[in-house]
Amino acid sequence: MSDTEYLARAEAVLAAVERTVDVANDGDHDIDLERNGSVLTLTFENGSKIIVNLQPPMKEVWIAAKAGGFHYRFIDGEWRDTRTGTEFFSALTDYATQQAGLPITFSA
């Protein structure tokens, strides 16, 4: 994958996360979302955070959550955990639901 392709796909991930948080905040959630360049910080009502950031040199997207740090690479049309193969949006859904205490579903 070229650098241009990576950036387009990775930026689409950040945009999808932003859209999901906007929709969730219209409902029962109160998630503070801050974007600083290629880093998104989601802060939940209980003060816990999830950070999603791009790693262009490695062509990866990373998640830092209470559950740990996770690296995702674009494989066969999806962002997959480099260790477990878990799909990015499925994993983010699990981490955010655990930290928010309310269900929230992320998708592309």
Swiss-Prot record:
Keywords of this entry: Iron, Metal-binding
Top-rank taxon: Bacteria
Biological function: Involved in iron-sulfur (Fe-S) cluster assembly. May act as a regulator of Fe-S biogenesis.
Family, per entry: Belongs to the frataxin family.
Family matches, as PANTHER family: FRATAXIN (PTHR16821), FRATAXIN, MITOCHONDRIAL (PTHR16821:SF2)
NCBIfam families linked: FeS_CyaY
Descriptive protein name: Iron-sulfur cluster assembly protein CyaY
Gene name of the record: cyaY
